[in-house]
A protein has these predicted regions:
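Bacterial Sec-dependent N-terminal signal peptides
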Residues: 1-20
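Boundary/junction segments of secreted and surface-exposed precursor proteins
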Residues: 15-39
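Short, surface-exposed loop/turn motifs at beta-strand boundaries within globular domains
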Residues: 25-27, 48, 76-80, 91, ...
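Aromatic-lined ligand-binding clefts that engage carbohydrates, nucleic acids, or primary amines
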Residues: 32, 55, 85, 91-112
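Short, tryptophan-glycine- and acidic/Ser/Thr-enriched carbohydrate-recognition patches
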Residues: 34-50
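Residue-level detector of high-confidence beta-strand sites
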Residues: 37, 60, 117-118
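Surface-exposed, low-complexity/disordered Ser/Thr/Gly/Pro/Asn-rich loops and linkers
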Residues: 48-84
């Protein structure tokens, strides 16, 4: 099965086939596609079939203003980030965990479905919408 993961800044998904170990399907430093929007992006940007070939590419973690970012971005309100991964046998997965480090808010999607959010209000956030609070990345 092919999956699409979309969210802000440094993200890793962890899966485990048996309780005795975890496997990461998205690794730190993996290449992602990203968009620094000047207007609202296409409404299907978070769908698997969306063609993001015109977006920029960079390795995770994304950010600005400190020395821990692999892909340095200009100061911006929002960034849209996409990555794909493949799971060959979904039947062996008992759970998936989203682990991310972010400033200041995020909305995460998996195959077009929202799976997590923090400090971002509204059903579909606007590209120029600031977060609802402050959260400093820990890494």
């Amino acid at each position: 099965m092919r999956y699409l993961s979309l969210f802000s800044f440094f993200v890793s998904f962890l899966t485990y086939a048996q309780i005795d170990h975890w496997e990461s399907v998205v690794l730190p430093g993996d290449q992602w596609q990203y968009l620094l929007p000047s207007s609202q992006p296409n409404s299907n940007w978070n769908q698997v079939e969306f063609n993001s070939s015109s977006w920029d590419s960079g390795n995770s973690g994304f950010g600005y203003g400190d020395a821990d970012d692999t892909t340095v971005l200009p100061s911006t309100i929002s960034v849209y980030i996409r990555s794909t991964f493949t799971i060959t046998d979904a039947s062996v997965i008992e759970a998936m965990v989203l682990d991310l480090d972010y400033d200041d808010g995020f909305v995460a999607y998996l195959n077009g479905q929202e799976i997590a959010r923090n400090l971002v209000s509204g059903s579909v956030p606007n590209f120029d919408q600031a977060s609802d609070g402050n959260h400093e990345a820990m890494l």
